[in-house]
Amino acid sequence: MTSKTKIDEIDVSIIRALQKDARTNFADIAKDCKVSLDTISKRFRRMRRTGVARGTTILLNPKNFGYDCVASFEIRVDYPHIEDVVDFVGKMPEIVFSTSSIGRYNIFAIAILKNVGRLGQLKESIQGHPMVREVAASIWVDEILLCPENFEFEHVKKK
């Protein structure tokens, strides 16, 4: 059993500030919290050490990179093959996140797509795996901000 890390209002203020902008200056957070810069630095280091904060990141808007839509896939597979299918789906170039889940579907995945037409093709590719029983797809319609590590920048020219 893992023990929960205790956090207080100052820790929450640090987290909220960094969620809004990962580049927020610790001095500004300290001023807002009415504590010293050293307090904020130590608390952030503690949150990193204990795993509360695993890092800071940038949010990307896929539409600014020429992607028309973001879609989620819910996939039902036979139980002993979940990890195999998670790996299979995760290797597809458009998939930026895949994980096992609990519920009607065993796997959840997120894809960024150049166009809506690609949705059906990707769904068919997933459905083509012999252990996949069902695939449901949904297109996200609201503002989309992602921070996946494996976001593809295929159109960027290499130097």
Q: At which residue positions do the language-model features occur?
A:
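A compositional/biophysical signature of low hydrophobicity enriched in polar/charged and small residues
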Residues: 1-159
